[in-house]
């Protein structure tokens, strides 16, 4: 009976020790870095980047993240100084700087006016993901005065 108690206590002690070793071997990821499959996305837009270029005081800035595991692109675009309210916002691809391409997705206008915001999430196809990661996606904001686009910005990614 005493032998049974010794083995039982030794068994439970080994389980507790194993658990303690497991927990102590885990490393807390508190360095602020994103996962290996998450990329920061950004892009500044101006009329000079449109093709052909347009004269406007409007500008825009895109920021967000792209997760290559889920193919989800979370974005926020803020613009100021447009000639009027935005009529449409799109991502376009495949295109390098200065080259035009067709729209690949419409973006939601959250707050509209000469100053405004577009915020949302889009799911990219594998082909669109390749365009994004190779710097071949741009966004542009259309207005009544500039139906083909008043400001344009190339989207760049960086893995963190």
Where do the model's predicted regions map?
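Solvent-exposed serine/threonine-rich low-complexity stretches and specific carbohydrate-binding patches
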Residues: 104-112
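Acidic glycine-/aspartate-rich tracts in secreted/extracellular proteins
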Residues: 81-83, 94-99, 144-146
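Bacterial Sec-dependent N-terminal signal peptides
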Residues: 2-3, 18-42
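Aromatic sugar-binding surface patches on proteins
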Residues: 71, 114-123
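Transition segment at domain starts
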Residues: 32-68
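Bacterial N-terminal signal peptides that target proteins for export
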Residues: 2-13
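Short, exposed beta-strand-loop hairpins at the edges of beta-sheets
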Residues: 129-131, 137-154
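Divalent metal-coordination and catalytic microenvironments
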Residues: 62, 89-93, 139-141
């Amino acid at each position: 009976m005493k032998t049974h108690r010794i083995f039982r206590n030794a068994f439970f002690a080994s389980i507790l020790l194993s658990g303690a070793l497991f927990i102590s071997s885990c490393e807390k990821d508190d360095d602020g870095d994103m996962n290996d499959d998450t990329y920061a996305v950004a892009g500044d837009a101006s009329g000079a980047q449109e093709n052909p270029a347009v004269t406007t005081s409007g500008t825009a800035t895109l920021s967000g993240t792209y997760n290559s595991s889920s193919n989800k692109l979370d974005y926020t675009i803020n613009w100021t100084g447009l000639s009027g309210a935005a009529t449409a916002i799109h991502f376009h691809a495949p295109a390098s700087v200065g080259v035009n391409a067709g729209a690949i997705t419409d973006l939601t206008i959250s707050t509209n006016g000469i100053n405004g915001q577009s915020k949302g999430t889009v799911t990219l196809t594998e082909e669109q993901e390749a365009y994004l990661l190779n710097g071949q996606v741009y966004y542009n904001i259309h207005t009544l005065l500039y139906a083909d686009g008043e400001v344009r910005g190339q989207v760049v990614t960086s893995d963190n």
